[in-house]
Regions:
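S-adenosyl-L-methionine-dependent methyltransferase catalytic module, highlighting the catalytic core
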Residues: 1, 26, 43, 50, ...
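Conserved alpha-helix/loop element of class I SAM-dependent methyltransferases that forms part
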Residues: 1-13
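Conserved class I S-adenosyl-L-methionine
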Residues: 14-23
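Conserved SAM-binding loop of SAM-dependent methyltransferases across substrates and taxa
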Residues: 24-35
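Conserved SAM-binding motif I beta-strand of class I
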Residues: 37-42
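Conserved SAM-binding strand-loop segment of SAM-dependent methyltransferases
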Residues: 62-80
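A short acidic, Gly/Pro-enriched loop at the edge of an enzyme's catalytic core
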Residues: 78-89
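A short beta-strand submotif of the Rossmann-like class I SAM-dependent methyltransferase core
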Residues: 92-95
């Protein structure tokens, strides 16, 4: 399931695209299908491994062209390993609520975004998120590594 409306974003042939917090790569795969040059970045090594394997299978199946794939990297959104002004479009979907220093992550994403580029960020809706926190300690940090560290309100967005 895509959590970003791709038709509203300038993603097409030649777009240099970053999926920051790619997880298992669903947004990276869609950008590659649309012809973008894709970098998928995630903090979790196991997700990086799975995403690399999925990209390889997509090449083999002819779903995407090899020149649309730049790489899948393990990295930290608060310390991105890219030069300034590297990407035309960045998606960080359902990621910021996992990052202790979300402001630092947003600064980094802005730093690597080209002037005039587009950053699309999504976070979970407040009400369902609140219910999940109440129902299970395993949903959020510190009870689970990589869990949610905050619930965003409308005013924080």
């Amino acid at each position: 399931m895509l959590t970003v409306q791709f038709d509203r974003l300038p993603i097409g042939p030649g777009t240099v695209f970053l999926d920051a917090g790619a997880g298992f790569g669903r947004h990276a795969f869609e950008a590659a299908r649309r012809g973008a040059h894709v970098v998928a970045l995630d903090y979790a090594q196991e997700e990086v491994v799975v995403t690399r394997a999925t990209f390889a299978a997509m090449f083999e199946a002819g779903e995407i062209r090899e020149n649309n794939f730049v790489g899948v990297l393990r990295g930290d959104a608060t310390r991105l390993p890219f030069p300034d002004n590297s990407f035309d479009c960045i998606i960080t979907s359902e990621v910021l609520e996992h990052i202790q220093d979300d402001v630092a992550a947003l600064h980094e994403l802005s730093r690597v975004l080209k002037p005039g580029g587009v950053l699309a960020a999504t976070v979970p809706s407040w009400f369902p998120e609140k219910i999940n926190w109440m129902l299970s300690d395993e949903y959020h940090a510190p009870h689970v590594v990589g869990g949610h560290v905050r619930i965003y309100s409308g005013t924080e967005l």
